[in-house]
């Protein structure tokens, strides 16, 4: 058995807890306590000689000091080391931006959870006096020796050597001796003495706001097998010239500091994305101790915290600390729900920087799992009670859920599963939390519209403009600035600060008799336990958002003005009572009710299927709507009886932290009401290519103006060119001509079909009895097998035409609108349709459901495209020539009915159009491709040749240059259509009638196809 190696003069085995030093001569190891070498002094030794080697080689050699050349012998151009005496001297003399630009200075009684919710805990807060903070501290006569008495002199602590910016271990008793020694060879700083488990903890109580916000205080279970994170109480003992370099507190925690004695100077940097990126690069650089991070950012603020003052630094702020005089302070770190996303971001930065465990938040991921479970309970409880969470809680829940998904991925799970509590079902928690968040977001998108501060409140006064250190008798008011999008882009006027305080003071006087003076107290982490309500002259007033949730018309622009005669705003006082500033007239109330109804009707369209709330596959984003229509975006497959947000109507209700003043109201609107609301909305707009394609294909939209919405009018120049072409072709433009009759049939059929569909109910297009609906019922979807293949092909080709109807074109290119999507069928070849397809574009997440139509784009008058006019003229000339040739060949053709079909419109042309799902330019029904294996394409194309729609530029280009001879519903480009199809008809007809020899190169179908392909590939009019 091998013997255990022993070291040092004491000949004991290695002990990891004891400091040891190696002799540079004999290479043996010695305990520092055995040879008289302290750990903090070992860094100054260049060559160490043990007691045995000291006899032969002399004493240990110390490092040469360069302090004698402080002022005049300094090397020029050499950077200063962070923490050195020269660095501290230069730092003291530098000028920084004043922190008064960013920090808030409320009184202790004003600093409540409600204050942080309204003002957002995103900037530092300096409280000049501890009164009202609910904090317990020792008397100012408390000293470092008293700390040693309550903690114990044998307590091992972490001490920072400021000159080296390195950490070392030291007993508290030894540090106290150093602190009171007359000559300090080094600058030592104690900033991480956590005393929660010592007797000193009985003398210090954290601020009330910290106790209410802290996750550890409120959410950490007592029976948890993981060790409870103790980061709430720290004692900081710093000597003069102590300096802590720039850092973010572990886990993105917020921090509070109270200076009991002395002074501390904080250098603060805002945690913007750019600054965080710079900080990460600076922290990972090899010469970090030679660069002052404050020089790399745009602004670095200086904040002095003097004796008796308390500073709260929010999540993510990058800060450094300088101690100008000996200082004794208390502080602590805490995680909270006000900025969860930033906390997670700071945690990820720590992981990327490979921060040591000593400087990390203990069990950070464990507490996050508990918080995720708690937020889920909050969402469920608020929804069951018809209340709504605040925006910071929704954003925090989303950030947590994203982190949970990342931590539980298969490749990352081994690194994170050790911190997952056994009581948490991770997969179910992620799914339920995503469901609740989606419910909350959908409720507001369906009823209120997209706005950044619907869930929460916002501060309206910039930092420093109105001091928050007003006397106790003044009333502080904060208002939510709702910037809902309106039609004219205007925003509601804000209140002047003077008017706000005047009104608030009057209301405060009226409610001062309701109870004793005090503050409203909340517990953020326990939304179901209510604190006692108190009111008083210093109570906070908050605007109820009733009347501000709709901003759809111009007459709302001046409603926020307090000087007006009508104002729907009400002050919600701290006791829950609602006091209305001005009486709202009946006409104004009627306008508000009307707008609420109209918004509700548009938002709650009838959907064919139920919304699967437990499925993440139903999420869908449609980015083709413009900003002006963003507030009318309808989410697909939403439940029919969806709870709806409405302003709070109970004046005595207590608002919980993490909640806004809204109630949920169940929806009992009938389908008849919805049809009226949707038709009224659709009647105000006009169609455009892209959105109406989906509406027509899914057969969900009907209305009296539907036919007018489906086709954009041609420009005057195009219409003149078409008329000229018809005249040159000897075609009459009266109603008897095939072109006019076919166009008239299409228009009349579209009108009759749309009127019939609107009378039968929303979502039906065909006038057949099978598609009729009764009021109050859900729309009946037609089964896929009701449609044959020819109908699907017609629908596909019609959608292709309509999708390009509103696009600008010239002879060579098509110019789609900016709103066109990559999946637009007009921009790529359409794949073969399935029988059960509802003609909706493929989406990786969901099926696309009807959206609202776009507005008409103005047609540019007087614009002419030379290539188009040239093509029209050439096509018209060839048409006239072909008509003459056809008249000469009539006597040789036996099939007289075929020519009648060409020259005269058939009486049944208007009938098949009635059953088409969308307006079409075709006037002849397609034969069933399944029943007719080889349909004669040429006569069918001839019947379409006289249609006015043949000469409009709505043909969809084939991506592969294939001839579209068999697709009657998709007209070709003007030049190609007229020069190639008619000769083939004549040759084929004459060949069938008398066996006349065909033209050279056009004898077989293959030759004719090759001729057409060549024209497609090289023709000037190729689209």
Curated annotation (Swiss-Prot):
Residues 472-497, 534-561, 732-803, 815-865, 877-1009 are annotated as: Disordered. The PHD-type zinc finger mediates the binding to H3K4me3. Binding to H3K4me3 promotes its access to H3K9me2. The linker region is a critical determinant of demethylase specificity. It enables the active site of JmjC to reach the target H3K9me2 when the PHD-type zinc finger binds to H3K4me3. Residues 195-351 form the JmjC domain. Phosphorylation at Ser-33 and Ser-84 are required for dissociation from chromatin and accumulation of H4K20Me1 levels during prophase. The keyword Transcription regulation applies. This is Histone lysine demethylase PHF8. Residues 733-742, 749-771, 912-932, 986-995 have a biased composition (Low complexity). The lineage of its organism: Eukaryota, Metazoa, Chordata, Craniata, Vertebrata.
């Amino acid at each position: 058995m091998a013997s255990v190696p022993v070291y040092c003069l004491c000949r004991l085995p290695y002990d990891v807890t004891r400091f040891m030093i190696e002799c540079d001569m004999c290479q043996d190891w010695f305990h520092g306590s055995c040879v008289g070498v302290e750990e903090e002094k070992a860094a100054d030794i260049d060559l160490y000689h043990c007691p045995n080697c000291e006899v032969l080689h002399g004493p240990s050699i110390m490092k040469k000091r360069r302090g004698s050349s402080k002022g005049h012998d300094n090397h020029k151009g050499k950077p200063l080391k962070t923490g050195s005496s020269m660095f501290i001297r230069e730092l003291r003399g530098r000028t920084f931006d004043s922190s008064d630009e960013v920090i808030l200075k409320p009184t202790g009684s004003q600093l409540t959870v409600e204050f942080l919710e309204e003002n957002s805990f995103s900037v530092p807060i300096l409280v000049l006096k501890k009164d009202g903070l609910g904090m317990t501290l020792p008397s100012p006569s408390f000293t470092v020796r008293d700390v040693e008495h309550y903690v114990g002199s044998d307590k091992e602590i972490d001490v920072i050597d400021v000159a080296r910016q390195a950490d070392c271990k030291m007993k508290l008793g030894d540090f106290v001796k150093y602190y009171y020694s007359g000559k300090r060879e080094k600058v030592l700083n104690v900033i991480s003495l956590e005393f929660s488990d010592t007797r000193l903890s009985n003398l210090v109580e954290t601020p009330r706001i910290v106790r209410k916000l802290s996750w550890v205080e409120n959410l950490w279970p007592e029976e948890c097998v993981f060790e409870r994170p103790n980061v709430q109480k720290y004692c900081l003992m710093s000597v003069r010239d102590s300096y802590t370099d720039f850092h973010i507190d572990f886990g993105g925690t917020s921090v509070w500091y109270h200076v009991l004695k002395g002074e501390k100077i904080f250098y603060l940097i805002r945690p913007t994305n750019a600054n965080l990126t710079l900080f990460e690069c600076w922290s990972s650089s090899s010469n970090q101790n030679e660069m002052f991070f404050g020089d790399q950012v745009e602004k670095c603020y200086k904040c002095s915290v003097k004796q008796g003052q308390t500073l709260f630094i929010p999540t993510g702020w990058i800060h450094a600390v300088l101690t100008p005089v000996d200082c004794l302070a208390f502080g602590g770190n805490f995680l909270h729900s006000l900025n969860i996303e930033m906390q997670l971001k700071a945690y990820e930065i720590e992981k990327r920087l490979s921060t040591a465990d000593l400087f990390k938040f203990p069990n950070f991921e464990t507490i996050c799992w508990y918080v995720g479970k708690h937020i889920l309970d909050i969402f469920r409880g608020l929804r069951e009670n018809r209340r709504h969470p605040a925006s910071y809680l929704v954003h925090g829940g989303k950030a947590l859920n994203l982190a949970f998904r990342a931590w539980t991925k298969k490749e990352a799970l081994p690194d994170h599963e050790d911190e997952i509590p056994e009581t948490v079902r991770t997969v179910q928690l992620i799914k339920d939390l995503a469901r609740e968040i989606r419910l909350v977001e959908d409720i507001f998108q369906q009823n209120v519209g997209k706005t950044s501060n619907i869930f929460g409140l916002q501060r309206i006064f910039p930092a420093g403009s109105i001091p928050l250190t007003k006397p106790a008798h003044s009333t502080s008011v904060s208002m939510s600035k709702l910037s809902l999008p309106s039609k004219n882009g205007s925003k509601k006027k804000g209140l002047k600060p003077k008017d706000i305080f005047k009104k608030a003071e009057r209301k405060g006087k009226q409610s001062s008799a309701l109870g004793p003076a005090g503050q409203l107290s909340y517990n953020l982490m326990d939304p179901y336990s209510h604190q006692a309500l108190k009111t008083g002259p210093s109570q906070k007033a908050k605007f109820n958002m009733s009347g501000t949730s709709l901003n759809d018309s111009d007459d709302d622009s001046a409603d926020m003005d307090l000087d007006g005669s009508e104002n729907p705003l009400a002050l919600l006082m701290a006791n829950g009572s609602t006091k209305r500033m001005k009486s709202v007239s009946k006409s104004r109330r009627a306008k508000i009710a009307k707008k609420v109804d109209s918004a509700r009707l548009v938002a709650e369209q009838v959907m064919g299927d139920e919304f699967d709330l437990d499925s993440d596959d139903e999420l869908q984003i449609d980015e083709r709507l413009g900003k002006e229509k963003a507030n009318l975006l309808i989410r697909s497959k939403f439940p029919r009886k969806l709870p709806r947000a409405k302003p709070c109507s109970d004046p005595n209700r207590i608002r919980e932290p993490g909640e806004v003043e809204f109630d949920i109201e169940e929806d009992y609107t009938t389908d008849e009401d919805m049809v009226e609301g949707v038709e009224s909305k659709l009647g105000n707009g006009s169609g455009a290519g892209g959105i109406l394609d989906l509406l027509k294909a899914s057969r969900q939209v009907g209305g009296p103006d539907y036919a007018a919405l489906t086709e954009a009018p041609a420009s005057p120049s195009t219409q003149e060119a078409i008329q000229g072409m018809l005249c040159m072709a000897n075609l009459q433009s009266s109603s008897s001509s095939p072109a006019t009759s076919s166009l008239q049939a299409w228009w009349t059929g579209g009108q009759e079909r749309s009127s019939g569909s609107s009378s039968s109910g929303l979502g039906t297009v065909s006038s057949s009895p099978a598609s009729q609906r009764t009021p109050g019922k859900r729309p009946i979807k037609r089964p896929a097998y009701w449609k044959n293949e020819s109908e699907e092909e017609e629908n596909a080709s019609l959608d292709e035409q309509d999708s390009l109807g509103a696009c600008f074109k010239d002879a060579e290119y098509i110019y789609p609108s900016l709103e066109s999507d990559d999946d637009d069928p007009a921009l790529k070849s359409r794949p073969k349709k399935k029988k059960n397809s509802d003609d909706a574009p493929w989406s990786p997440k969901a099926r696309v459901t009807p959206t609202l139509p776009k507005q008409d784009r103005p047609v540019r008058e007087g614009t002419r495209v030379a290539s188009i006019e040239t093509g029209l003229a050439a096509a018209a000339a060839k048409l006239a020539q072909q008509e003459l040739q056809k008249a000469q060949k009539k006597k040789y053709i036996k099939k007289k009915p075929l020519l009648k079909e060409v020259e005269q419109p058939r009486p049944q042309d208007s009938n098949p159009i009635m059953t088409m799902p969308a307006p079409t330019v075709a006037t002849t029904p397609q034969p069933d491709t399944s029943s007719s294996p080889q349909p004669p394409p040429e006569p069918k194309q001839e019947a379409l040749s006289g249609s006015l729609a043949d000469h409009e530029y709505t043909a969809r280009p084939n991506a592969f240059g294939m001839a579209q001879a068999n697709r009657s519903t998709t007209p070709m480009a003007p030049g190609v259509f007229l020069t190639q199809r008619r000769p083939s008809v004549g040759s084929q007809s004459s060949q069938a009638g008398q066996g006349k020899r065909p033209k050279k190169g056009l004898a077989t179908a293959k030759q004719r196809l090759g001729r057409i392909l060549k024209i497609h590939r090289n023709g000037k009019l190729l689209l």
